[in-house]
């Protein structure tokens, strides 16, 4: 990365946005694959160690032109990729090198934006993924409506090229990008767009995430601009990206463009309280609006997707619910607004009266039904939640059996420690503990009761019960009230956003 930075810094005055020459640098592909390209992929190039090989990349592009547009059969896809039998290998090599190149200006822009006097200016645009947790802790006192929004995807690939043009001015670079998209779409001409994106995300996930981040940033930049114009609340950080790729200058461009294009639209969204948070493709919009204004926001999103991104989205993709009567699902938690009624006696001079105060709190709960279904699927319990022995693990050693159950139990505990009520979490732990004991008893061909009498059961179960307590006992005394309060309260582990996996049973 330092070599690329030096390359761009030396040419910043004349070629700041020109990345096309980097496509023909062999070390780009060596960095992508973790080894020298000509030693491992093209046998005929053994011993060729030139650092700037124009021949290799030109040969790749030429072979892409010469390939048939027919879809590769299943038998061909199983052949060795590095011997030329799979036609898609050429486009895949170039695309993986392309994403390394295209990320360079954004990385440099991020580092240069934090230098000198501009640090305050750009610091305001930083959006942390950890803002999801303050949303979970928010009491939502002034909010009464919630909208579940699922951002539609995929969009037309040409739209992504146009979005990327705001950032770079290299015409040759975009011609190559269009050619790659055109080749890939024609090669998969018999596949639906949804299936195409699914295949693309598996073949080159890094490139897919970059394009998806670019699309989501464009979508949220427009929304956040309108939100700032129509809301009096301080904007907290809500723009979230998988790889935490931040883009900044687009906001300044939107201020000039959208202020002109949406001058009449803003009058329809005079909403002083809007709360917005997103993770992956799902976002939550919470507001104090009336149903009429919430429907206006709903159709604003639909028109934005259809007119600006050419994505057809049905109105049913956005669901509007009243917070006090509906629970919604976000980040594998069930969220609902809990109302706590308090009666306060007040006295003024000789008159006294009672006041009812309603306090709101966003309640985060463990989705017990979904988790039990997951345990049933993995055969840890039956549909009623009764623990079962894991027969396929009966041939393992005692240490491996206990370690596997501990790992699964730790995953649940780590992910759902932010729940406001731990009863359901303790139930899941109980199922796993008893399933572990039944598995060990089955291995030793004994009943559970006889096995517990013969084995030191307290030492076995101690691993499960003291997991969280041991962590906090290193900070607070074991008899401290602070430890007890933390153990019962909500604890958020920040890394659950990066290791997010709904199937926690198989996630280790």
Swiss-Prot record:
Sorted UniProt keywords: Chloroplast, mRNA processing, Plastid, RNA-binding, tRNA processing
InterPro entries on file: Domain_X (IPR024937), Maturase_MatK (IPR002866), Maturase_MatK_N (IPR024942)
GO biological process: mRNA processing; RNA splicing; tRNA processing
One GO location term (cellular component): chloroplast
Gene Ontology terms for molecular function: RNA binding
Localization, UniProt: Plastid, Chloroplast
Task performed by this protein: Usually encoded in the trnK tRNA gene intron. Probably assists in splicing its own and other chloroplast group II introns.
This protein's name: Maturase K
Organism encoding this protein: Abrus precatorius
